[in-house]
Amino acid sequence: MPVDINRLTDGWLELESDPGLFTLLLEDFGVKGVQVEEIYDLQKNIEGPVYGFIFLFRWIEERRARRKIVETTEIYVKDEEAVNNIFFAQQVVPNSCATHALLSVLLNCSDIDLGNTLSRLKVHTKGMCPENKGWAIGNTPELACAHNSHAMPQARRRMDRNSGVSTGRFTGEAFHFVSFVPINGHLFELDGLKPFPMDHGPWGEKEAWTDKFRRVMSDRLGISTGEQDIRFNLMAVVPDRRIAITHKLKMLRTNQTIVSAALEKLLKSKRTESRSLETVDKIKKEEESPVKLSSEYSQLLEMNEKDDSSVPMSKELESLVSLNSSSDSVEIIGETEIKKENPPPSPPPSFIGAGTFSPKDLLSLLKNLESEINITEQHLCDENEKRAMFKVDDCRRTHNYDEFICTFLSMLAHQGELGDLVSQHLITNRKPNMGSVQNSGSRGVVRNYNKKTTTNGSSPKTPSSKRRRGRTKYRKRK
């Protein structure tokens, strides 16, 4: 929308309490790695870290009238230096409580990627008083544009009628957003309509700050006493689930590669070992072959002793025999070593040793990794689809259907069908009231019946009317 810097603080529109809307609003602010989730069960533990909570509650007109009265409360933090060192902004711009609640969480966390706009705002408002921080929020064009881009078209028309501070749904009542964040080991409640931030105290050493928050909210909502007001909404600002799922998927795939390589290496070593065992068996069968070769060569030498040309040959054979015998001796030594190193095999246990696995264990582990990878990929797909649906719902929420409806009704009127449709609609609405029409008709019959009763003195169906007619005939005979 076009930005008028002179009237920037006058045009903020009210927003719905929807986690998808708040998540998209974070993206428009330039924040990365953060999303908003709705909390349905306050007593259920929340998985993973939580940056803060956003609480939507009913703001009654009576409370709104008393908001200017500064209450003396023990949980108020009135130290000016302490208040200015945290990001607490008073809401001076109407209908900006949704953005205030988000900024109260984001700008009080040090491990969030705020982006350029919010980083500049955080540096600019450092050390400011709460009122000036509120004006700084209202006069930031990027925040105003992002805020109003997610408002319904009805909010613009409703803004002219309702000039209250927070969002209104009907006369005398509105809904307001506040934030709960952990700051310096204490649970703080940041409400832009209050003059000071509220410190609910530290949490225990062996508990998380979310446990402290649940206790505070249970007491406020009356859950612990059974007097619960169901007209509230609770959302949590958490890290983007897709980042954790993507990291988990990467680790699973890395482990899958490692296990596959280990399994392949183990199978390769098994194949090498089986080949060596086959060689040992072959050596067992050929243990007597050196003796046979020596006898054959000796006979050959005896046959050729008388021949002078057989000498070199004998020398070559001797060398060959010596070579074979030496090689045979080496092979036998190797065989004895193999026999000593490899005793008769025993049934392999599940775990051969510390940190080692059998092929069966590796196959089972690889199967579990593949199953976990499929589940994690489905979770990532679900998160991406949910983020896509956030955008679809936002388009449906912010689209102005007035032009379409007016054009559609004009076309029906031009074709002469609008009157018939309106008549059918009116007849359909009258059908549930047919019982009252019949009752009114029956009351009319009663009125006519009463007239006859008044004229004749009694009902014509009663025995007295018959006697009256009899008396009349008797009088006529006289």
From Swiss-Prot:
It is found in: Nucleus. The active site is at 97 (nucleophile), 176 (proton donor). Residues 400-428 form the ULD domain. Residues 430-478 are annotated as: Positively charged C-terminal tail required for binding nucleosomes. The record marks 191 as: Important for enzyme activity. The keyword Nucleus applies. Residues 11-239 form the UCH catalytic domain. The keyword ATP-binding does not apply. The record marks 91 as: Transition state stabilizer. Keywords: Chromatin regulator, Hydrolase, Nucleus, Protease, Thiol protease, Ubl conjugation pathway. Residues 432-442 have a biased composition (Polar residues). InterPro entries: Papain-like_cys_pep_sf (IPR038765), Peptidase_C12_UCH (IPR001578), Peptidase_C12_UCH_sf (IPR036959), UCH_C (IPR041507). GO terms for cellular component: chromatin; cytoplasm; PR-DUB complex. PANTHER family: UBIQUITIN CARBOXYL-TERMINAL HYDROLASE, UBIQUITIN CARBOXYL-TERMINAL HYDROLASE BAP1. Catalytic component of the polycomb repressive deubiquitinase (PR-DUB) complex, at least composed of caly/calypso, Asx and sba (MBD5/6 homolog). The PR-DUB complex associates with nucleosomes to mediate deubiquitination of histone H2AK118ub1 substrates; the association requires the positively charged C-terminal tail of caly, probably due to direct binding of DNA. Interacts (via ULD domain) with Asx (via DEUBAD domain); the interaction produces a stable heterodimer with a composite binding site for ubiquitin. Catalytic component of the polycomb repressive deubiquitinase (PR-DUB) complex, a complex that specifically mediates deubiquitination of histone H2A monoubiquitinated at 'Lys-119' (H2AK118ub1). Mediates bisymmetric organization of the PR-DUB complex and is involved in association with nucleosomes to mediate deubiquitination. Does not deubiquitinate monoubiquitinated histone H2B. Required to maintain the transcriptionally repressive state of homeotic genes throughout development. The PR-DUB complex has weak or no activity toward 'Lys-48'- and 'Lys-63'-linked polyubiquitin chains. This is Ubiquitin carboxyl-terminal hydrolase calypso. The lineage of its organism: Eukaryota, Metazoa, Ecdysozoa, Arthropoda, Hexapoda. The gene is caly.
